[in-house]
Regions:
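Glycine-rich phosphate/adenosyl-contacting loop at the front of the ribokinase-like
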Residues: 1-62, 69-83
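Ribokinase/PfkB-type carbohydrate-kinase core domain
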Residues: 1-15, 60, 77-90, 101-179
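Residues in the short beta-alpha loop(s) of Rossmann-like NAD(P)-binding domains
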Residues: 65-68, 168
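Short, glycine-/polar-rich solvent-exposed loops and beta-turns at beta-strand/coil boundaries
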Residues: 92-94
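Short alpha-helix plus adjacent loop in nuclease-associated cores
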Residues: 96-99
Length: 179
C-alpha cells in the first residue's frame, strides 16, 4: 500500500463557458430572433470540482484554458470556490472551451455548437509534469473530454483510485480500453 501525503482530490477534465439562448417566439431562420441569453460556467471537470468543493473536499483541478476573458471568469470562480487551479495549463492565444446552444420557444434545443479543442492540450506529457501531484491525491476523478491517451496515462501511471465520468455515449468509448 502506498501512503499518500495529500488530503485532496485531483480532478482532470474540461472547463467550459456555456452560452445559451432561448427564443421568445418560433425561430425564424437567417434572422435575428428576440429572446434571452444566459452565460454560465460548466465543463464536466469543473462541475465535478465545484460539487466536491461544496462538499468540503480540497480539490486540485488539472485542466486547460485560454488567456481570454472566459479564462478570467473561470479562474475567479474557482478561486471563490476554493478550487486550486495553480497547476492548470493556460494556453497563450488559446480559446477557453465554449459551448453555445440555442433553444426554440418550447425549450427544445435547435442548435448546439461546441468549441472544446483546448481539451486536447491535457496530454500525457502535461499529466506527467504533474505526476507527483496526482499520485499524492487521495482520489483522481477524470472526464472523457480529455484525450484517450491521457486516460490511459492516468490508469497506468497513477496510484490513487481513478474514477471516470464518461460525459456522453460517444465519449464513453474512450473508457473501454482502460477498464
Amino acid at each position: 500500500y502506498v501512503l499518500r501525503s495529500g488530503t485532496y482530490a485531483a480532478v482532470v477534465g474540461g472547463v467550459n463557458v456555456d452560452i445559451g439562448g432561448q427564443s421568445y417566439a418560433p425561430l425564424v431562420a437567417r434572422d435575428s430572433n428576440p429572446g434571452r441569453v444566459r452565460i454560465s460556467l460548466g465543463g464536466v471537470g469543473r462541475n465535478i470540482a465545484h460539487n466536491m468543493s461544496l462538499l468540503g473536499v480540497d480539490v486540485r483541478l488539472l485542466t486547460a484554458f485560454g488567456d481570454d476573458l472566459h479564462a478570467q471568469r473561470v479562474a475567479a470562480s474557482c478561486g471563490e470556490l476554493g478550487i486550486d487551479i495553480s497547476h492548470a495549463l493556460q494556453v497563450p492565444g488559446g480559446t477557453t472551451s465554449t459551448y453555445l446552444f440555442l433553444n426554440d420557444v418550447d425549450g427544445d434545443m435547435a442548435l448546439g455548437l461546441s468549441d472544446m479543442d483546448i481539451c486536447e492540450r491535457i496530454t500525457p506529457a502535461y499529466l506527467a509534469s504533474n505526476l507527483s501531484l496526482l499520485n499524492n491525491a487521495q482520489v483522481i476523478v477524470a472526464d472523457t473530454n480529455i484525450p484517450a491517451e491521457s486516460l490511459q496515462y492516468l490508469v497506468t501511471h497513477c496510484t490513487p483510485p481513478v474514477f471516470v465520468d464518461p460525459v456522453s455515449t460517444a465519449k464513453a468509448r474512450k473508457v473501454q480500453p482502460v477498464l
